[in-house]
């Protein structure tokens, strides 16, 4: 009787461990795909022009023109330098 219970316990462990590993793999894959997706949506400064500047209240304001893009905005230039710049997307 103890031998049967031991065998059942081992079989249960063999079943549970691979399924939990697969779940971890799925979560890792989702994270990787999400990172790739948002990286693709990054704003571009190429093809953008306009007058974008920081106001006294600290916010970036101005007019931007993005030829060949569907979305254009004036905002912080985080990666390049401290200040404001026009960014395009789409």
UniProtKB/Swiss-Prot annotation:
Disulfide-linked positions: none
Descriptive protein name: Conotoxin Ca8.2
Major subcellular site: secreted
PTM summary: Contains 5 disulfide bonds.
Any one Gene Ontology cellular component term annotated for this protein: extracellular region
This protein's record includes keyword Secreted: yes
Family: Belongs to the conotoxin S superfamily.
Tissues with expression: Expressed by the venom duct.
Positions of post-translational Glutamine amide modification: 89
Domain remark text: The cysteine framework is VIII (C-C-C-C-C-C-C-C-C-C).
Secretion signal, residue range per the UniProt entry: 1-21
MF (Gene Ontology): toxin activity
Keyword terms: Amidation, Disulfide bond, Neurotoxin, Secreted, Signal, Toxin
Location in the cell: Secreted
Domain of life: Eukaryota
Residue positions assigned to the propeptide: 22-46
């Amino acid at each position: 009787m103890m031998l049967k219970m031991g065998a059942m316990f081992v079989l249960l462990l063999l079943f549970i461990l691979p399924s939990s590993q697969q779940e971890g793999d799925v979560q890792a894959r989702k994270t990787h795909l999400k990172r790739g997706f948002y990286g693709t949506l990054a704003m571009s400064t190429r093809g953008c022009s306009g007058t974008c500047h920081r106001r006294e209240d600290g916010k970036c304001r101005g007019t931007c023109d993005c030829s060949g893009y569907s979305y254009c905005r004036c905002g912080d230039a985080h990666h390049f330098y401290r200040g404001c710049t026009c960014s395009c997307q789409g």
